Amino acid sequence: MQITNMHCSGQTVSLAAGDYHATIVTVGAGLAELTFQGCHLVIPHKPEEMPLAHLGKVLIPWPNRIANGCYRYQGQEYQLPINEHSSKAAIHGLLAWRDWQISELTATSVTLTAFLPPSYGYPFMLASQVVYSLNAHTGLSVEIASQNIGTVAAPYGVGIHPYLTCNLTSVDEYLFQLPANQVYAVDEHANPTTLHHVDELDLNFTQAKKIAATKIDHTFK
């Protein structure tokens, strides 16, 4: 276990258990690197550099895109800042570029916490926690929890954004299996739209098959 000083990705925490090694950064509570016997299990990024897109980030209080940054909740309309202009969307929440705090640390685990204050597009309060744990036999586990510490009910979603890899080889030959039988179609800006059976969009991965040239930027259910 090792902590480095502040840089583009905040602080860096290095964890190890058996043949597994992980690098966690405090900005976005991100997973910057995960290896087994030296082989990469996620696409890594250098903590001293700004990562590609939301590589490795925790996405709170929503993952994916909200078209035009506009949503309705309990009869009221809210407007979020547009942070992906190519899709004209509010993407991946409000904590991906915040510097989380390290609250607990061991040789094999780290706990990070963050406070999300109210804002005009999301006037709710959350206290969030992420725990990364390495086990020499089972590898990495991630636990994410958020508590609504405001006085009214809050809309909430969560996701994580690692880019899985088999030691940085091409995904075309990978076998992919996902136990989901529904998927959201996307519009020309990759915003999710209507729910379909996976067969309708030719995205049925309930049985393992090669990814090949299939483009997957969808929400499955």
Question: Language-model segments: what does each one mean?
Answer:
Residues 15, 116-156, 160-167:
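Acidic, contiguous internal or C-terminal segments within carbohydrate-active enzymes
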Residues 23, 65, 73-85, 172-175, ...:
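Surface-exposed interaction patch
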Residues 12-14, 21-23, 109-113, 129-131, ...:
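Beta-strand secondary-structure signal
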Residues 1-80:
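Beta-strand-rich N-terminal accessory domains
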Residues 163-221:
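Active-site/ligand-binding surface loops and adjacent short beta/alpha elements
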Residues 33-37, 89-93, 121-125, 151-157, ...:
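A short, polar/proline- and glycine-enriched secondary-structure boundary/capping micro-motif
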Residues 2-3, 82-136:
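Extended, loop-rich substrate-binding clefts of extracytoplasmic carbohydrate-active enzymes
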